[in-house]
Amino acid sequence: LIGEVRMRLIVMLVSFVLTTQLWAGELPQPSGTVLLTLSGNIENTNADGKAVFDTASLEKLGMVSFQTTSPWYNGRTTFTGIPLQKLMDYVGASGSVVKVTALNDYTTVIPLSDFKKYNAILALKINGKYMRIRDKGPLFIVYPYDSMPELNNQIYYSRSAWQVSSMDIE
C-alpha cells in the first residue's frame, strides 16, 4: 500500500512539473545557428520574451511541401517548409498582423489570417534542397499561388518575403 501511494505521488509530481512547464510557455532552446526570431504578442518564448529557432527546431514542427509557379522561378517549383499557421499556434501568437523583416531589411506586413486562409509556409527547401542566402534562403514565405487565382497578384507577391530573419506579431 505504501509503495502504491508513493508511486501515485511521483506520478502526480511529474504531472505537476510538466503542466507547469507547459503553462509557463517555455520553448526548447535551439542548439544550432538561430535563423528566425519571433517577437511581439507571443505567449511561448525561449529567449528573453522572444522565440528563436534554428533549422532543427523549425523542422520539428512538421514540414509540408507543395508545387507552384511563381514570378521568381521558371516552371513549377517544389517548396518545403513549416505551415505558418502552425508556427503561430506554437508560439501562441495573438494579434492581427505580422511584420516580417528580411536579412536585407526589406519589410512587409502580412495579416495573420493569411496563414490559415491560404496555407502559406515558411519554406526552408526548394526542390528538395535547403535554400542558401543567395538563393532567397534560408527562409522564404511562400503561398501556394496556383491553388487560388486571387493569390496571383502583387499583393501576395509582396508578402512573400525571402531571406526572412524576424517576425513581430502585432
Predicted regions and their residues:
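Positively charged n-region of N-terminal signal peptides that target proteins for export
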Residues: 2-10
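Bacterial N-terminal signal peptides
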Residues: 11-21
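N-terminal intrinsically disordered, low-complexity segments enriched in P/E/S/T
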Residues: 3, 25-170
